[in-house]
Amino acid sequence: MRKHLSWWWLATVCMLLFSHLSAVQTRGIKHRIKWNRKALPSTAQITEAQVAENRPGAFIKQGRKLDIDFGAEGNRYYEANYWQFPDGIHYNGCSEANVTKEAFVTGCINATQAANQGEFQKPDNKLHQQVLWRLVQELCSLKHCEFWLERGAGLRVTMHQPVLLCLLALIWLTVK
């Protein structure tokens, strides 16, 4: 009986070691006061423009010139006007576990088109529209999901795998 109880204690210790107890934050005055830190904006201070900046498909314009081939005429136009074009896109379509690259790029392009309809419907400059479309396609195809890199590279280690491994070892030792 004593040997059987020692295995349960071992299982309890393993469960505590690999559980989420390390993620629990301690509460105290020291953790509440953050010296020399800027206060986070309250909900009243967050403007509609700030919310719109982070919507899916929103352009990121920082004035960087990207190395993308638009063809001879498109390259000249982009050289002269690169500061008017986006150099990034806010889009995170990686929430689905099995999303393919093609579905991800299509979703990114559709979200970008929906979020920036005014940019895409300027009828005055056809070359600007062509360069913008090519740029959006490139920016969306350059984005990636982390799990694409991990496919084929073995198992992803999650928090539950060490616990399952410990339980498997416990069952094996108990049966032995």
UniProtKB/Swiss-Prot annotation:
It holds the Pfam family Doppel. Belongs to the prion family. InterPro entries: Doppel, Prion/Doppel_b-ribbon_dom_sf, Prion/Doppel_prot_b-ribbon_dom. GO terms for biological process: acrosome reaction; intracellular copper ion homeostasis; protein homooligomerization. Residues 1-25 form the signal peptide. A lipid is attached at G152 (GPI-anchor amidated glycine). One of its GO terms (cellular component) is external side of plasma membrane. It is a lipid-anchor; GPI-anchor. It comes from Homo sapiens. This is Prion-like protein doppel. Glycans are attached at T43, N98, N110. Required for normal acrosome reaction and for normal male fertility. Can bind Cu(2+). The keyword Nucleotide-binding does not apply. Residues 51-152 are annotated as: Globular. Its main location: membrane. The keyword Ubl conjugation does not apply.
